Amino acid sequence: ALQSMIETIQEMQHHIRTAFGDSKSSYGPNPTGPPPQGILQGNGAGPATWAAITSVIIQCMKAEGFGFDAWSTISQRAMSLVCFGFIDDTDLVLNSSDPHVTAQELIETAQRELVTWEGLISATGGALAPEKSFWYLIDVSPEGQFASPADSPGDLILHNKGSPIVIERLPVSTARETLGIW
């Protein structure tokens, strides 16, 4: 069944259908290039397929040591997260269990995490959207105050298909909608 679905997608002529009708232009099999990839938007198998793909990507990230580890004082259990995701939007999380790690070291680890995530998404045929990308560094002083970006400088850079771009960094006091919530 899977082979039948993929072969059909790769060999058919694709048109776009909207409320205004079907597109006149189309794309389809290219005998001199690679076949179209993906399973198409609106495919009923899309959510399950993406869940299967992202579960492998998340395990790769975890195997590389990325994520957020903490101890829940309520449940008395260890928690380990790599990301929060919904459909094709994902928030990566990262912390260090080393109380002596510096903000600069954490930013360097976050850059490696971003490069790894971007590479894994690229391997699926996807790409990260710079305009939807932003990050926070939650750095707390011994006095319990949040450090500003000026106090803990650093940038994260998306490779962006060979056109590197600095991702917007927000102060912890600034909210931004993500995954449909604030």
What are these regions (language model features)?
Residues 122:
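Anion (oxyanion) recognition and catalysis
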